[in-house]
């Protein structure tokens, strides 16, 4: 095995190990939250565990990004992130999972007291917005990996990064979070230029997924609020 192939194999293995550790930690905290709420209904316990797991996973990512400067971002981005297709599948899965989790709540909402209604409303909205945030954090990390990838896609110059930032400083994770969340909210970024063909395709998928996600979220939020605060409750 060549040195380059061995390096790629090691990097790929470390990605799976890091992701497995994060998922296990998030799942453990979610399971603890589920287990410590035996008096709640099953749907409520599932959604509470889901929220805690999502918050734990996001916290682990933010904690790592907060301690990373530009050099650390370059070195670490390839160790915690995967290919385009895995990112898209993960983002779509997370979006659907949050909506499914909220759907568990809707068919039982009219049997709750006002206090429990407010509690479940908070759980439902937290699930939606935590998942929305995680989807775009995942895309931001993916943009960092594509930017610092030492082997660019075929046909693209190796000496020109796929993103052009307005200053001459090396971008860190927060620069890529800015890019990802601005795309998610505004569908465009005025001060960062996209110069890579492969990255344009990822951005297109990101924007389309974001639009679909926001459309579904708005529909679910209206349904949740309308169901939970209905005068017939």
Where do the language-model regions lie?
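Juxtamembrane helix-capping/reentrant segments at transmembrane boundaries
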Residues: 73-93
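Loop-to-helix transition at the N-terminal end of transmembrane alpha-helices
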Residues: 41-59
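Membrane-proximal soluble regions of multi-pass membrane proteins
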Residues: 147-149, 153-193
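Pore domain of cation channels
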Residues: 175, 179-182, 190-231
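Transmembrane alpha-helix/helix-exit interface in multi-pass inner-membrane proteins
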Residues: 129-154
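The first (N-terminal) embedded transmembrane alpha-helix
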Residues: 15-37
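Hydrophobic alpha-helical transmembrane segments of multi-pass integral membrane proteins
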Residues: 24-29, 87-104, 178-182, 217
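Alpha-helical transmembrane segments and their membrane-interface junctions
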Residues: 94-115, 181-197
């Amino acid at each position: 095995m060549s040195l380059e192939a061995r390096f790629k194999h090691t990097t790929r293995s470390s990605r799976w190990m890091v992701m497995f550790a994060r998922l296990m930690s998030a799942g453990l905290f979610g399971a603890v939250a589920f287990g410590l709420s035996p008096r709640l209904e099953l749907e409520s316990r599932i959604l509470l565990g889901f929220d805690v797991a999502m918050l734990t996973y996001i916290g682990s990512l933010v904690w790592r990004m907060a301690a990373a400067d530009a050099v650390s971002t370059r070195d670490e981005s390839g160790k915690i992130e995967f290919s385009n297709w895995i990112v898209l599948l993960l983002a779509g899965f997370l979006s659907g999972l949050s909506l499914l989790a909220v759907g568990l709540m809707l068919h039982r909402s009219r049997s709750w007291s006002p206090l429990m209604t407010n509690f479940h409303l908070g759980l439902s909205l937290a699930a939606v917005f935590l998942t929305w945030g995680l989807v775009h954090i995942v895309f931001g990390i993916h943009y960092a990996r594509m930017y610092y990838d030492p082997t660019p896609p075929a046909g693209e110059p190796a000496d020109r990064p796929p993103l052009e930032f307005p200053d001459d400083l090396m971008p860190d994770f927060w620069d890529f979070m800015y890019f990802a969340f601005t795309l998610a909210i505004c569908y465009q970024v005025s001060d960062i230029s996209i110069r890579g063909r492969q990255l344009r395709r990822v951005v297109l998928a990101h924007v389309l997924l974001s639009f679909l996600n926001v459309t579904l979220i708005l529909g679910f939020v209206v349904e949740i609020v309308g169901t939970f605060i209905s005068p017939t409750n």
